[in-house]
Amino acid sequence: MEKDLANYRRSYEKGELLERDIPDDPYILFESWFNLADNSKNVEEANAMSISTVGKDLMPKTRVVLLKSFDPDGLYFYTNYDSVKGRDLDENPKCCISFFWPSLEKQIIIQGEVVKVSSKKSEEYFHSRPRGSQLGAHASNQSSVIPSREYLEERLTKLEQKYLKKEIPKPKEWGGFLFKPVAFEFWQGRASRLHDRILFTKKDDNWKIERLAP
């Protein structure tokens, strides 16, 4: 298998990120960029983010997860704690999250650590999900090896019968994480590959702001 991609390139000319427009708080800029993506007709699932983890095996792993909320404390997402992702974060809570919105020529890379959210918060979010998603969380022992697609569908059918007209309990191994950032990098594509890169690094209760070479 071979394919030459050397000529795959485009010029980025849709925006700029200048010091005069940068707030002191990265959360303000994050919210502004997120809202821009969320309101854009050219962006699907603005809350889709890549999460990179490294467990005790020291092998980096990246997957796309959906951001479910954010506030001044950080970013929230939910998963099966027994999944590869969950095990990695239990062994090493440091991780990296990134958002890329190609149509806006914007990217945000965030470094930080996670903590598990309260069982109450996980319960509240779990029961806000569609019923099918709740059943799916029970049917799938995430990241485990299964014999076939049919095996999964049979489990779902049995669970549908088991919880017919009943409330579906949250699986004990399912819950949320709060990702607490220590660094934000905002990337804005620019012409001639002279992109804007602004780095916020947390220092005690303040943020240090620096421009990085592209």
From Swiss-Prot:
Entry note: cofactor: Binds 1 FMN per subunit.
Domain of life per record: Bacteria
GO biological process: pyridoxine biosynthetic process
Broad class of enzyme this protein falls into: oxidoreductase
Protein's name in the database: Pyridoxine/pyridoxamine 5'-phosphate oxidase
Subunit and partners: Homodimer.
Residue stretches spanning the membrane: none
The protein's annotated pathway: Cofactor metabolism; pyridoxal 5'-phosphate salvage; pyridoxal 5'-phosphate from pyridoxamine 5'-phosphate: step 1/1; Cofactor metabolism; pyridoxal 5'-phosphate salvage; pyridoxal 5'-phosphate from pyridoxine 5'-phosphate: step 1/1
Residues engaged in binding substrate: R9, R10, S11, Y12, K68, Y125, R129, S133, R193, L194, H195
Cofactor(s) the protein needs: FMN
One Gene Ontology molecular-function label: pyridoxamine phosphate oxidase activity
Chain's role: Catalyzes the oxidation of either pyridoxine 5'-phosphate (PNP) or pyridoxamine 5'-phosphate (PMP) into pyridoxal 5'-phosphate (PLP).
Recorded catalytic activity of this chain's protein: pyridoxamine 5'-phosphate + O2 + H2O = pyridoxal 5'-phosphate + H2O2 + NH4(+); pyridoxine 5'-phosphate + O2 = pyridoxal 5'-phosphate + H2O2
PANTHER family documented for this protein: PYRIDOXINE-5'-PHOSPHATE OXIDASE, PYRIDOXINE-5-PHOSPHATE OXIDASE
Keywords: Flavoprotein, FMN, Oxidoreductase, Pyridoxine biosynthesis
Family (UniProt): Belongs to the pyridoxamine 5'-phosphate oxidase family.
EC number: 1.4.3.5
Gene3D superfamilies attached to this UniProt entry: Electron Transport, Fmn-binding Protein, Chain A (2.30.110.10)
UniProt-listed Pfam families: PNP_phzG_C, PNPOx_N
Gene name in the database record: pdxH
Binding site for FMN: R63, V64, V65, L66, L67, K68, Y78, T79, K85, Q107, Q142, S143, W187, R197
